[in-house]
Amino acid sequence: MYTLARQLLFKLSPETSHELSIDLIGAGGRLGLNRLLTPKPASLPVSVLGLEFPNPVGLAAGLDKNGDAIDGFGQLGFGFIEIGTVTPRPQPGNPRPRLFRLPQANAIINRMGFNNHGVDHLLARVRAAKYRGVLGINIGKNFDTPVERAVDDYLICLDKVYADASYVTVNVSSPNTPGLRSLQFGDSLKQLLEALRQRQEALALRHGRRVPLAIKIAPDMTDEETALVAAALVEAGMDAVIATNTTLGREGVEGLPHGDEAGGLSGAPVREKSTHTVKVLAGELGGRLPIIAAGGITEGAHAAEKIAAGASLVQIYSGFIYKGPALIREAVDAIAALPRRN
């Protein structure tokens, strides 16, 4: 069924089909249809971050930026859902066209620029949803907020989403907001992490529960830079790391239509780079905080590959666009077949 739906959706522009897909998935959720149309994955419970996941395969941030289809995605069999990236104030993002399919490579290039309706809209959608599974909320800074003041935007969002999130992801790795990736390095990273940690502790006292913080990083760092990030996360007492966001590289899409568009590349071409980052992090962290792997999972075996590399959980986005909900079950089955899970 998804093959037919994809053929129809792919006749539309990428962003139009994205918006229509969110509407359809959301409507299916409200009517309770999605669970009837999608085979439920096998149960593969895992405990990470003090949270109980029915399976380790989640939806990556970016697909449902505003939380408009939480119930719909929740009925497809995901072990957890991450919505956003959301910013303190609504913003339109970059000019269109800004989203490009590269079907020959099972890839997508985007330069969306954190387009979203703002954190207050997202929270209204979260509170209206019936979904009671693990929900991550991914936060970022507004385009017109200077990088030097970025921490203010992150703290505004953290304050607002804390009570409604199972965990919060801090996005410092999108390539489509100028200067954002500089927050992954040196004193900028340390200052951001310290501010987040202090606010997390204050919010935990206020709300009576500690909501884990994850940092989402880029795949384009050197091994040495990744090691420094890992050390900073441990030192600051962060709870998890998500590896990775999209890449600025173009390996695997050279010469393809739209292959030279500006923006972040996701899908199959980023798989090896992302998995390598997971391996480096796993070696540096030594189990001190969990890794959530994202990037290039277009087959079940790719999800198992991420877990074998050291991840505790995985997330899918581009693979879901190309393969549909069947990828969730395929990924769960592949992870279940790993020796260490038997």
UniProtKB/Swiss-Prot annotation:
PROSITE patterns: DHODEHASE_1
GO molecular function: dihydroorotate dehydrogenase (quinone) activity; dihydroorotate dehydrogenase activity
Protein EC: 1.3.5.2
Cellular localisation: Cell membrane
Pathway: Pyrimidine metabolism; UMP biosynthesis via de novo pathway; orotate from (S)-dihydroorotate (quinone route): step 1/1
Cofactor note: Binds 1 FMN per subunit.
Cofactor requirements of the protein: FMN
Residues annotated to bind FMN: 61-65, 85, 138, 171, 216, 244, 267, 296, 317-318
Active site per UniProt: 174
Mode of membrane association: Peripheral membrane protein
Any one Gene Ontology cellular component term annotated for this protein: cytoplasm
Biological processes per GO annotation: 'de novo' pyrimidine nucleobase biosynthetic process; 'de novo' UMP biosynthetic process; pyrimidine ribonucleotide biosynthetic process
InterPro entries per record: Aldolase_TIM (IPR013785), DHO_dehydrogenase (IPR050074), Dihydroorotate_DH_1_2 (IPR012135), Dihydroorotate_DH_2 (IPR005719), Dihydroorotate_DH_cat (IPR005720), Dihydroorotate_DH_CS (IPR001295)
Chief localization: membrane
Keywords: Cell membrane, Flavoprotein, FMN, Membrane, Oxidoreductase, Pyrimidine biosynthesis
Binding site for substrate: 65, 110-114, 171, 176, 245-246
EC main group: oxidoreductase
Substrates-to-products reaction catalysed: (S)-dihydroorotate + a quinone = orotate + a quinol
Cell membrane as UniProt keyword: yes
Subunit structure: Monomer.
Protein family membership: Belongs to the dihydroorotate dehydrogenase family. Type 2 subfamily.
Role noted for this protein: Catalyzes the conversion of dihydroorotate to orotate with quinone as electron acceptor.
Protein name per the record: Dihydroorotate dehydrogenase (quinone)
Gene: pyrD
